[in-house]
């Protein structure tokens, strides 16, 4: 659009935050939020501001950043992205602290007592920030689990000061925020709500601004009452479990959640009061879709995709084995990415087998558990899912032993359950098995519902297939729509073919447990990555990055 410049784009950015019907910076007319003109102006302004930042111009048009300073403002105020920590060489931080320390699972509203002085190199990062401008702290070349936990520790200390006053009245991303020290920018919207990029000045004495993501989700009046009684949304409870995986060195491929607050009025246009929750999380600067633009050498493309696929299946394995969680919405938009140096390797241990995973510069992050379900009895839900077969113990066991039940619980309105005789298949070789709290289905063998490896829920299959089809293309399993897929090397398409070509039906193959269990699938696909040496973890190897035990003993999770 002709007439747009840095000044008008800055005014447009302010207008969007103040009103859901902002005025056009060109015509002065009110524009519908997320309408075609609104989107066009937003997109063009993003380009203008990005080009201005690249030129070193002041995209904040004035001294907006100076308001965070204590005392007189500096001689000049620069753009947010103009001065980043000047890391000339990637630094890999040894993560022995994260896997050998006595770390406790995440308590509600708090991150951990992981002290920042334990993280080598953080003081050096602070000193390299520009002395007269707020800089954004990026993970790209300093990405490691201890570094993420250190940032979380600082957020915890920050929120301890405000949670008593603002726990149920913190409207950061609303049109009329209740706190003045956050600066927000909307980066995504959907039927679930809004995701915003938020800058907090908690490091202002070091002249560093740390970004984070805030997910605003609408909640009903009944959910609000439950929150007041500390019965939080299910998604946040899942996030709490996910945090424990990061704190205990189980798997790094998840988003770290900092805190949850509630806003009593999320909109200023509706006459009806709209309540929402605001979840503070790590911020990542792109989804898996961004790797389509990556230029990878032809001889490295196969290893590049295999590294990403392994890490995603490792995240699925962590939620399956440890909590019985089915994500139900795996797609490229829900796989965020963190960029690394592209050097070295990680070690993932799954059922006693250590896999050396090459670092190809991308760490996929599984996010958004809004429609996820847990079938574990320890998670508090009453539905334990369909359990059609037993998988014998052993990391290389792909056999599936079907069993039968006599009764089938059926859930009706208001979650009222009635018990009916179980149904047989036409050949009368197996029954439809479902387990529910308080109902004895009379199985033909003893069934341990908490053991997700021996008695996996049937819906585990959905996440396994969705990950493969996300790369090859195809229909989604539980949600409407299609996976667009990637331009893959033929070897990767053939690599994923055994998963993609198997239809989802009611009868399970007898020797393909890897279609349900990510732990078995990783052994089936990546057996050549297993480290068969009996040596200890190579902490002194300069190429070694971090170690994760994806399937730890149950005692480690409950300690």
Curated annotation (Swiss-Prot):
<dbReference type="GO" id="GO:0004674">
    <property type="term" value="F:protein serine/threonine kinase activity"/>
</dbReference>
<dbReference type="InterPro" id="IPR014901">
    <property type="entry name" value="2-cysteine_adaptor"/>
</dbReference>
<keyword id="KW-0067">ATP-binding</keyword>
<dbReference type="InterPro" id="IPR011009">
    <property type="entry name" value="Kinase-like_dom_sf"/>
</dbReference>
<keyword id="KW-0808">Transferase</keyword>
<feature type="binding site">
    <location>
        <position position="215"/>
    </location>
    <ligand>
        <name>ATP</name>
    </ligand>
</feature>
<comment type="similarity">
    <text>Belongs to the protein kinase superfamily. Ser/Thr protein kinase family.</text>
</comment>
<feature type="binding site">
    <location>
        <begin position="187"/>
        <end position="195"/>
    </location>
    <ligand>
        <name>ATP</name>
    </ligand>
</feature>
<keyword id="KW-0547">Nucleotide-binding</keyword>
<dbReference type="GO" id="GO:0106310">
    <property type="term" value="F:protein serine kinase activity"/>
</dbReference>
<keyword id="KW-0418">Kinase</keyword>
<dbReference type="InterPro" id="IPR017441">
    <property type="entry name" value="Protein_kinase_ATP_BS"/>
</dbReference>
<protein>
    <recommendedName>
        <fullName>Probable serine/threonine-protein kinase 010L</fullName>
        <ecNumber>2.7.11.1</ecNumber>
    </recommendedName>
</protein>
<feature type="domain" description="Protein kinase">
    <location>
        <begin position="181"/>
        <end position="526"/>
    </location>
</feature>
<keyword id="KW-0723">Serine/threonine-protein kinase</keyword>
<feature type="active site" description="Proton acceptor">
    <location>
        <position position="329"/>
    </location>
</feature>
<dbReference type="GO" id="GO:0005524">
    <property type="term" value="F:ATP binding"/>
</dbReference>
<dbReference type="InterPro" id="IPR000719">
    <property type="entry name" value="Prot_kinase_dom"/>
</dbReference>
<dbReference type="InterPro" id="IPR008271">
    <property type="entry name" value="Ser/Thr_kinase_AS"/>
</dbReference>
<dbReference type="Pfam" id="PF08793">
    <property type="entry name" value="2C_adapt"/>
</dbReference>
């Amino acid at each position: 659009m002709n007439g747009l410049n840095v000044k008008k784009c800055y005014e447009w950015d302010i207008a969007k935050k103040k009103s859901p019907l902002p005025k056009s910076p060109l015509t002065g007319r009110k524009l519908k939020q997320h309408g075609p003109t609104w989107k066009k102006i937003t997109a063009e302004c993003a380009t203008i501001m990005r080009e201005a930042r690249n030129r070193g111009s002041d995209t904040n048009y004035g001294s907006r950043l100076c308001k965070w300073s204590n005392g007189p403002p500096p001689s000049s105020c620069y753009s947010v992205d103009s001065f980043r920590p000047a890391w000339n060489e990637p630094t890999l931080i040894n993560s022995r602290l994260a896997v050998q320390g006595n770390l406790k699972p995440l308590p509600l509203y708090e991150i951990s007592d992981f002290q920042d002085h334990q993280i080598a190199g953080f003081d050096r990062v602070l000193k390299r920030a520009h002395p007269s401008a707020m800089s954004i702290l990026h993970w790209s070349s300093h990405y490691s689990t201890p570094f993420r936990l250190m940032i979380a520790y600082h957020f915890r200390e920050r929120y301890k000061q405000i949670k008593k006053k603002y726990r149920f009245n913190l409207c950061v991303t609303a049109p009329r925020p209740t706190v003045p020290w956050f600066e927000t920018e909307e980066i995504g919207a959907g039927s679930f709500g809004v995701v915003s990029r938020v800058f907090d000045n908690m490091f202002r004495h070091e002249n560093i601004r740390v970004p984070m993501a805030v997910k605003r989700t609408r909640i009903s009046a009944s959910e609000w009452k439950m929150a007041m009684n500390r019965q939080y949304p299910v998604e946040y409870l899942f996030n709490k479990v996910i945090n424990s995986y990061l704190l205990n060195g189980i798997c790094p491929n998840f988003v770290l959640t900092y805190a949850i607050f509630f806003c009593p009025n999320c909109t200023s246009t509706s006459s009806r009061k709209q309540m929402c929750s605001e979840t503070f999380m790590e911020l990542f600067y792109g989804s898996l879709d961004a790797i389509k633009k990556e230029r990878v050498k032809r001889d490295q493309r196969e290893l590049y995709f295999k590294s990403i696929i392994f890490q995603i299946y490792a995240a699925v394995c962590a939620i399956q084995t440890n909590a019985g969680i089915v994500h139900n919405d795996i797609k490229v938009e829900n796989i965020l990415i963190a960029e690394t140096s592209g050097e070295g390797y990680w070690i993932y241990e799954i059922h006693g087998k250590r896999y050396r995973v090459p670092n190809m510069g991308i760490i996929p992050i599984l996010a958004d558990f809004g429609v996820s379900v847990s079938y574990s009895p320890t998670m508090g839900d009453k539905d334990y899912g369909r359990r059609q077969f037993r998988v014998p113990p052993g990391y290389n066991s792909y056999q599936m032993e079907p069993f039968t039940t006599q009764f089938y619980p059926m859930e009706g309105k208001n979650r009222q359950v009635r018990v009916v005789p179980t149904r047989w298949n036409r050949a009368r070789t197996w029954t439809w098995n479902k387990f529910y709290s308080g109902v004895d289905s009379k199985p033909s063998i003893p069934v341990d519902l908490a053991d997700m490896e021996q008695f996996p829920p049937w819906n585990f299959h959905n996440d396994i297939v969705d990950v493969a089809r996300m790369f090859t293309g195809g229909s989604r399993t539980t949600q409407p729509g299609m996976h667009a897929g990637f331009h893959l090397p033929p070897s990767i398409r053939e690599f994923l073919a055994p998963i993609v070509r198997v239809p989802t039906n009611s009868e399970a193959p007898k020797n393909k447990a890897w279609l349900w269990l990510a732990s078995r699938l990783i052994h089936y696909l990546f057996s050549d990555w297993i480290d068969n040496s009996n040596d200890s973890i190579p902490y002194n190897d300069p190429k070694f990055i971090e170690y994760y035990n994806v399937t730890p003993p149950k005692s480690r999770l409950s300690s």
